[in-house]
Structures are given as structure tokens and as C-alpha cells.
Amino acid sequence: MAKSEGRWWIWGAWLTIGVGVVGFGIVLFTLYGINLGPISHEHAAWSSFGSLLSGFFMVASTGATVATLLFLAHQNKQIQKTNIEQQRVTNAQLAAMNFEQYVNHRRFFMERLNELQSMFGNTFVFENRDALYNKVFPKNTPTNLEFKAEVVTDPGSQNYLGALNLHLSVLRNYAKSPSGKDDGRWLVGKLINLSEALDLRMVNEVAEGDLEFKGQRTPLNIYGADEFVMVATAIYDSFMFYTGNDKAERLIFPMGRSANDSLMKYFLGREEYPEIVKVLKPLPGLEMLERIYFDLCGIETEHFGYLEPLYAQLMEIFSSPTGVQKLRNNVYIADLLETGRRCTAKALARSEKGADDYNKLKVISEDLDILIALK
């Protein structure tokens, strides 16, 4: 409708200008003819007529120019309207395309989280997936999509990926030089920081050594600190791949016994702030076995040789959560306690009463008797 009205308007302008020019010419030449009279043979008269004719054609050309300019102005206005409409349509198409890409990007991210859960036997789930996506890609919205994300480790502007990087770096440095670092509280704090950043909710069966923080079970087990760091590194590497960054540096040396022993010592007999952080030990007598394990380290070499079979077995047990799970087997633990009782009896027989080693061995022997009675 608007196009039709515009077309009629321009044709009306052309017709008005044309009729005006023709009418003006008729009136002009009629008046000139009346005043000039019969055809004159005078040069001045024809000169005046030529000037008149020239002036008329100038007016006619001016009218044509004005009409052309009006037409071009109208055409330009129509082109601008068309361009604006096309731009609006293009913007709408781009917005729809960007939104679709955003939705697909989020879906692929969620699918990757499912793959990570399956990779580790569905022992955990990511607690808040939407919040996790927004932390990994803080600039992404339905109207803006970025496939890469920076890893900012500077304390003043640190982002989520930068925080994960720093948590893992601290633990890598610990693994490189664990000697002399017997501060279990420090290690617990670093591991909990990493656990909280990942925001995982455990859905597997409770195991001996699982750590609870603020009433929620974490993916950390005090008998398998390395296993937790391995899971955390795999998750971080997945984020790095998805955001177009390099993977994390690998743990060249595992934290191993140093980490497990530090965590066990820290929680052994610890009772302060149980509502904040505590270790789940549903197996009866587990703490007593831990105490025997550490007491054996204080026995002098001359007597330790008799206890070595017991110590080696306990060291293997406390090296991983799987090892501790063996203690649920009644036959296995009965054999362990019998081995311990026999080794301790040999060491006691060769130790002088009242000696430091004798007293330590006596405590170990009594603890073993209590454990045997429990079974």
C-alpha cells in the first residue's frame, strides 16, 4: 500500500511539472505572438524570440531536473526503507542463529559433564551444571557467544579457571617436594578448596576414609588423596580442551604415602569442629589399626625386623581406599590380626622389660588383643 501511494505521488509530481511547463509555454508564446504581430523580417525581433525560446527551454529543463531530483529522492527513501527492513531481518536471523549456537554450546558442555561422570563410574554428579557453565564461560549469554575462555590467575582479577589452575599447582608443588611437610591441616585445606571449587556431589556408597565438609560428603578420601587429584585434573583438562586452552601439567610424582599419612595423622583422634570437617570411619577398630601403623614407625630397628610383615601389610592397606576396603573381609582381617599378634609376641620376647621399645610393643599388643576381641 505504501509503495503504491509513493508511486502515485511521484507520477503526480511529474504530471504537474509537465502540465505546468507546457501551460507556461502556451501562455508565453501566445502573448508573444499577439504582441509581435505578423512575421517580422527584422533581426531584432527574431533575436528577442530566440532569447524567449532559450528562456522557455531553460525553464523546461529546470522543471525536468526538479522532477528527476524528486524521483531520485523518493527512490533513495524507498531504498533506505528497504535497507532498514533487510537489516532488521538480518539482525533477527543473526540473533536466532546466535541463540541456537548458544543452546547447542551449552548442550555439548552438559554432555561432556555426563561423559566425565561416566568416566569415573558415576560415583559423583556435578551439583549445579548451569552455574558451572556460567563460571567456565562468564561472557556467554543468549545474545553473545564466545568459544574460548581465558585462564586468569592474577589474584586481583582471578576467574574460575584460574582458581582451579592455582589449586592444582599448589598440590603439584607439594607432590614434587613432600618431605618435611607434615602439616595435615594445611593439606586438608588445599584439598577441600579444590573440592569446593569443583562442586561435586557424591552418589556412591560411603567408604572408610571419605571426608565430609559442612555436612556434605566430598570426593576426597584420606587414604587416596592422589585419586582425588587425578579426578580433579581430568575435569580441569576437559574444561581446558572445551575452552581452547592447554591441559594442566601432570603430577610427575604422586603425593603417595606422604599425603595419606599426613591426613591420617591429622584426623586420628581429632574431635574439634566435627560439624565442619570429619572423616567417615564406619568400620569398627579402624582408628586403632591406624594408631598401630604409626606406633610401629617408632620401634627401634633391632625389634622392627620382627614386625616388618605386619607393617608391610598395614602400609599396603592404608595406601589406597581399595586397600582399606579389604578390612571389611572378616577372613582377611582375622589373618592380619593373627599376623600382628604373632610378630608382636616375637618382638616382645626379645625386648627388655621397662625399655622404651618394650612399653611401645606392649601397647601395640594390647591394641591387637582388643581388635581380636571385637572380631
Where are these regions (language model features)?
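Short hydrophobic membrane-inserting helices
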Residues: 1-74, 81, 99, 103-151, ...
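Amphipathic alpha-helical "stem/stalk" segments
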Residues: 81-375
